[in-house]
Amino acid sequence: MSKLNELGLAEARDALRAGETTSKDLTEACLTAIEEAGVLNAFVHHTADLALERAAAADARLAQGAAPAMCGLPIGMKDLFCTKGVASQAGSRILEGFLPEYESTVSQNLVDAGAVMLGKLNMDEFAMGSSNETSIYGDVINPWRRKDDEKPLTPGGSSGGSAAAVAADLCLAATGTDTGGSIRQPAAFTGTVGIKPTYGRCSRWGIVAFASSLDQAGPMTKSVRDAAIMLEAMSGHDPKDSTSADLAVPDFEAALSGDIRGKKIGIPKEYRMDGMPDEIEALWQTGIAMMKDAGAEIIDISLPHTKYALPAYYVIAPAEASSNLARYDGVRYGHRAKLDQGDGITEMYEKTRAEGFGPEVQRRVMVGTYVLSAGFYDAYYNRARKVRTLIKQDFETVFAQGVDAILTPATPSAAFGLGEMTDADPVAMYLNDIFTVTVNLAGLPGIAVPGGLDANGLPLGLQLIGRPWEEAELLNTAYALEQAVGFVAKPQKWW
């Protein structure tokens, strides 16, 4: 057996049930790996004592033979999920010292499934970013490096800590959230698997809100099978979230046959962007050929409103963020600015929010407030909502024609260097989401799967987009792609 922390969820689960290892051993192996990987800055709140306590409880359950799905499996939790009594800061100064009195539904579902939380993972502040450079905790460093180059690279964002931790084998899997690509883009940058389920599949209750009509939690794992196992544990109806779907959760793992013969895979012409790197185009063509070889039927499709997706997203998401983030005022919890004598409530709000929010969050709050203002509401926000409806209708039309899944690149490039894009126009950074935002706007499930390595030895990802509520079929298509790619590369340990 490989090192315990290098196992995936499925292998570790089988080893636990066969009595070949214990949750305590798995957890200790991960805690050691986390200690050795401090330079990656992936974990920001450590819960070693809690993890060992839960591991002991899991071992007791396993000994009785009544173990739930993820019993004894050590995972990381993105800092956006509220965890009872454990710091939950959303990567922001404004939530300094916040210890929730409650557990998010998704993290509670994982606890109920027997998972062992190792700690909280770094992320872009309030999930706003594509490179994990907006975090109050500092940058996360991608465990992958370019050939013969020691320059630190981004793991992507906003779930950069989750992606880096899974890629570096610091945990068996991790939770992420995806508002415009924040699970799929980091997964593509780190050679891991990340699925954003259909909007409403996982409860949003207890997850710090960015854009409520777009946010969705999902797993980041080492394989498609692991994603199926963890997504099932995370999912389920929650009466505390009005957008949570009252639907039965399928056995996602049982759907993984790898047989996609006769399935129709759509290839959208609008995703062939001007200036798309040759390596991304070649990766896409390879993916198409693999799907064909597996027996799928390839169909050219059109999603005509794709070019408006990014502008619409960057109106809707900041608008919802400006509304959601209005609650951080320094009154009830989190950071409160020191006030000068004579300062009133208005000065307290101003100073607290100026000190508590980083520049990217401030930028998006300003944009959001602007597009919601009386003079611009119709010109920007309402127009963006109409575009969103058209984007959704594009997908509905394609799926009505019998298309089962859509194959696209996950990102327009491999991981870039830290600092490379922070000095550029913010729009250049936003372009990282070009292949992923449509999926959030339409509320569809999307999964990123490793597709190979670029010339510099960095991972590149392919994205599959599925029909709403058909994650089981999407995971099976992704499983077939994963089998065809045969991606086994791991980052060389330098940390």
From Swiss-Prot:
Transmembrane segments: none
PROSITE patterns cross-referenced by the UniProt entry: AMIDASES
Catalytic activity line of the entry: L-glutamyl-tRNA(Gln) + L-glutamine + ATP + H2O = L-glutaminyl-tRNA(Gln) + L-glutamate + ADP + phosphate + H(+)
Name of this protein: Glutamyl-tRNA(Gln) amidotransferase subunit A
NCBIfam families: gatA
Family: Belongs to the amidase family. GatA subfamily.
Alphabetized UniProt keyword annotations: ATP-binding, Ligase, Nucleotide-binding, Protein biosynthesis
Quaternary structure annotation from Swiss-Prot or TrEMBL: Heterotrimer of A, B and C subunits.
Catalytic residue list: K78 (charge relay system), S158 (charge relay system), S182 (acyl-ester intermediate)
UniProt-listed InterPro entries: Amidase, Amidase_CS, Amidase_dom, AS_sf, GatA
Record-listed E.C. numbers: 6.3.5.7
GO terms for biological process, alphabetical: translation
GO MF term list: ATP binding; glutaminyl-tRNA synthase (glutamine-hydrolyzing) activity
Any single Gene Ontology cellular-component annotation: glutamyl-tRNA(Gln) amidotransferase complex
Signal peptide interval: none
Keyword ATP-binding among UniProt keywords: yes
Organism this protein belongs to: Roseobacter denitrificans (strain ATCC 33942 / OCh 114) (Erythrobacter sp. (strain OCh 114))
